[in-house]
Swiss-Prot record:
Major enzyme class: transferase
Protein's UniProt keywords contain Transcription: no
Catalytic activity: tRNA(n+1) + phosphate = tRNA(n) + a ribonucleoside 5'-diphosphate
Name listed for the protein in its UniProt record: Ribonuclease PH
Entries under InterPro entries matching the protein: ExoRNase_PH_dom1, ExoRNase_PH_dom2, ExoRNase_PH_dom2_sf, PNPase/RNase_PH_dom_sf, Ribosomal_Su5_D2-typ_SF, RNase_PH, RNase_PH_bac-type, RNase_PH_CS
Keywords assigned: Nucleotidyltransferase, RNA-binding, rRNA processing, Transferase, tRNA processing, tRNA-binding
Species of origin: Synechococcus sp. (strain JA-2-3B'a(2-13))
Entry's family note: Belongs to the RNase PH family.
HAMAP family tied to this protein: RNase_PH
Protein task: Phosphorolytic 3'-5' exoribonuclease that plays an important role in tRNA 3'-end maturation. Removes nucleotide residues following the 3'-CCA terminus of tRNAs; can also add nucleotides to the ends of RNA molecules by using nucleoside diphosphates as substrates, but this may not be physiologically important. Probably plays a role in initiation of 16S rRNA degradation (leading to ribosome degradation) during starvation.
MF terms (GO), sorted A to Z: 3'-5'-RNA exonuclease activity; tRNA binding; tRNA nucleotidyltransferase activity
Keyword tRNA processing recorded: yes
Length: 244
């Protein structure tokens, strides 16, 4: 018997995706991204400084922070104060690595962009929503830098490629994309895929949670994730008024 998705989606169907830009007043880039019932607030802030290892190089940097609000899940989670959990540290490193792939740091100049991803409501796929929404916030922050006269249009944009991410997994032997929490908790295999607009992979995280997976299953997961990510890239372009 095949798995019945809780929201009656097909195996390859994404949850409803939306981006509400300029969600906050002060950050140069901000967006409320929704993957179904997963809601993440992504902001991109700019500081005219770089980490010590980049000083006097003329290059910029991007870093990311990720947190989940206590009431984002069905059971309240304590705030992480002095020490991050291993999960939080792993996720924010993933977000940072993924979004750094979108930038040419020589063109960004000697400044740091910090992308903050705050999960307001969690129903699976928070890290992939954070990456996908984080790119939209990053794009708006770069636009803000141009408006401030901090970037020279003649030198070309620091943004070199779009980036989006999607979860994919195997539940009761069936490959599914964009897993909700119920599906994620039942998955035999859980993966997170990050790609750019050229269809190249930035990161693949895959774990056999309850069962091993075959090479054909791996290829099927990658193909279905790639198709779903193309939909997310198009949704980003529509939100940014960059439709092709």
């Amino acid at each position: 018997m095949s798995w019945q998705r809780p929201d009656n989606r097909t195996a390859a169907q994404l949850r409803p995706v939306s981006f509400e830009r300029h969600f906050t007043r002060y950050a140069p880039g901000s967006v409320l991204v929704k993957f179904g019932h997963t809601h993440v607030l992504c902001t991109a802030s700019v500081a005219e400084e770089v980490p010590p290892f980049l000083q006097n190089t003329g290059q910029g940097w991007l870093t990311a922070e990720y947190r989940m609000l206590p009431g984002a899940t069905q059971q309240r989670q304590p705030r992480e104060m002095l020490k991050l959990s291993g999960r939080t540290a792993e996720i924010q490193r993933l977000i940072g690595r993924s979004l750094r792939a979108a930038l040419d740091f020589r063109k960004l100049g000697s400044r740091t962009i910090t992308v903050d991803a705050d999960v307001l409501q969690a129903d699976g796929g928070t890290r992939t929503a954070a990456i996908t929404g984080g790119y939209v916030a990053l794009h708006d922050a770069i636009t803000w830098l141009y408006k401030q006269g901090a970037l020279d249009p003649a030198q070309g944009s620091p943004l070199r490629q779009q980036v989006a991410a999607l979860s994919v997994g195997i539940v009761q032997g069936e490959v599914l994309v964009d897993l909700c929490y119920e599906e994620d908790s039942q998955a035999e295999v859980d993966m997170n895929i990050v790609m750019n607009e050229q269809g190249s992979f930035i990161e693949i995280q895959g774990t056999a949670e309850a069962a091993c997976f075959s090479r054909p299953q791996l290829l099927q997961m990658l193909e279905m994730a790639q198709a779903g990510i193309q939909e997310l890239l198009q949704a980003q372009r529509q939100a940014l008024n960059l439709e092709r």
